Amino acid sequence: MDSPRNVTEFFMLGLSQNPQVQRMLFGLFLLVFLVSVGGNMLIIITITFSPTLGSPMYFFLSYLSFIDTCYSSCMTPKLIADSLHEGRAISFEGCLAQFFVAHLLGGTEIILLTVMAYDRYVAICKPLHYTTTMTRHVCIVLVAVAWLGGILHSTAQLFLVLQLPFCGPNVINHFVCDLYPLLELACTDTYVIGLLVVANSGVICLLNFLMLAASYIVILRTLRSHSAEGRRKALSTCGAHFTVVALFFVPCIFIYMRPSSTLSIDKIVAVFYCILTPMFNPLIYTLRNAEVKNAMKNLWRK
């Protein structure tokens, strides 16, 4: 049951109150948004229409690009609009919707990145069983599991917020609706809920990151017996994936693996994984992957 509340809308402080800085942020975030959406859509189109990119790795990469496109579209347009004027109001329902979608996509991406590491583990450590293990049916099931995990995670987070009474103030010291800034506005003791947030968000991030790290340790040990060319190709693919993992996981662990309090650096960290990481992902995968670059060139010639 929802807790009683007097608050019908929130006001976001954003990243800066300086009009000149706001104009600079508008141009910067508009450029980042266009590059992010354009780059990720280009990867989706390239994988969809390129017969040479039919392996499970690219199947998962297309879904990662789709999630990053949605993630950027969930966060950045509101931030761009808020940079143009001082009124940064968002309805209570709109705040919860943004919060739910962000955690849905974030939770799904965390699990999908772990699935992609498992795909690389099977391809490198058990190559003879790769085609029989990573069938199209298995890939679809793994993507479905990632989405289901994201739904369960975001639903649990939303349930925690709905238990909070909001009686005022209603000014969020952030540029997005997230748990810790909302916990600060609740007119009740939030210690227990803060621990549940750490258990739900922080532990999930940490456990998945540890599984990813363990899989790459096994992969690196296996690569010692491969040829120099085989090591180079595998390290190129795995290096791109691990870079994406580090860019997404490290900020998330920093934010959620600590008590429910906000730090001055939290906004900068949030900009990194909410706004910049979805832009970096397509750049990392295309610049370090010859197959993707060649497929893009072939599509361009057509």
Swiss-Prot record:
What residue ranges lie in the Cytoplasmic compartment? Answer: 46, 117-139, 213-236, 288-302
Gene3D superfamilies, A to Z: Rhodopsin 7-helix transmembrane proteins
Keyword annotations of the record: Cell membrane, Disulfide bond, G-protein coupled receptor, Glycoprotein, Membrane, Olfaction, Receptor, Sensory transduction, Transducer, Transmembrane, Transmembrane helix
How does the record classify its membrane topology?
Multi-pass membrane protein
BP GO annotations: G protein-coupled receptor signaling pathway; sensory perception of smell
GO CC terms in record: membrane; plasma membrane
Signal peptide stretch: none
Regions crossing the membrane: 25-45, 47-67, 96-116, 140-160, 192-212, 237-257, 267-287
Tell where it localizes: Cell membrane
Coiled-coil intervals, chain numbering: none
Per the UniProt topology annotation, the Extracellular ranges are 1-24, 68-95, 161-191, 258-266
InterPro entries, A to Z? GPCR_Rhodpsn (IPR000276), GPCR_Rhodpsn_7TM (IPR017452), Olfact_rcpt (IPR000725), Olfactory_Receptors (IPR050427)
Source species, domain of life: Eukaryota
Q: Which GO terms describe its molecular function?
A: G protein-coupled receptor activity; olfactory receptor activity
Q: Which cysteines are joined by disulfide bonds?
A: C95-C187
**Glycosylation sites recorded in the entry for this protein:** N6
What does the function comment of this entry state? Odorant receptor.
Family to which this protein belongs? Belongs to the G-protein coupled receptor 1 family.
- Name used for this protein in its record: Olfactory receptor 4C3D
UniProt lists the gene as: Or4c3d
